[in-house]
């Protein structure tokens, strides 16, 4: 299919720049994936669509405050570093600006010297492998010195960094939030659990590739970025049992879907304990083996994520729903409203 087939007109003012005061006060568009019927509701209405014996699968990754500002030791030049992916030991793949100032062997100091880095390798497109040195625990140092790496379409400063974390975030490693999960509070999850719905966690560390535009004309030629995922034995067994008993598997976010479908596609539809890297690209024509329904935000035109949701329903129904969302002034992207495709 052509990438252009997934385009739609989006007024810039519908791109949410800040989160709502209350996480659960977002709107919820409910889309019947087969008929295309649309209902405009509130996010807390999600409870009525979840039944006893269903599974609600959430991604418990935690966003790192991965943007660092430092000084090149040799010249005093200001350097911005964005952590992308942990390599061996204290080495990280990073994006450096301005990259031309940091060559192999160059050193950078952050803050008052609590964190230092040396460039081990130069990569293309401003990428650098940096090895960090510090006292104590790396993630605690990051909390002191780093900033949240908000998506490029969000222009306003975030007053409270916790609003770009889910309330259940636990596993450090993401460069961006699994934003469908931002709508949940502990109270809402407790109400869902009390209804007999099983709350199950997976882990997928979201990379910055999630914001990278698709730069080919035909979707068949697109190569996905890789992201680390993990599913525990307990979670795999619980989901398999629910499916065997006829319960629905409802994924919260495209990252949860990518985790479950990666594993199911390798094991004849079954889920097993597994960790690794996935480059799964889900687009129309894909046959889902693990997931029945999806809670997600509204995605960018021509993005791999709108292709994924089109695979769960179909392209014409999704684009009709998106056009309805524009007409009804839904809020889009990371801090925007939600959609339930079932």
Swiss-Prot record:
SUPFAM superfamilies: QueA-like. It is found in: Cytoplasm. Its main location: cytoplasm. Keywords: Cytoplasm, Queuosine biosynthesis, S-adenosyl-L-methionine, Transferase. It comes from the Bacteria. The keyword Coiled coil does not apply. Its EC number is 2.4.99.17. Belongs to the QueA family. This is S-adenosylmethionine:tRNA ribosyltransferase-isomerase. The gene is queA.
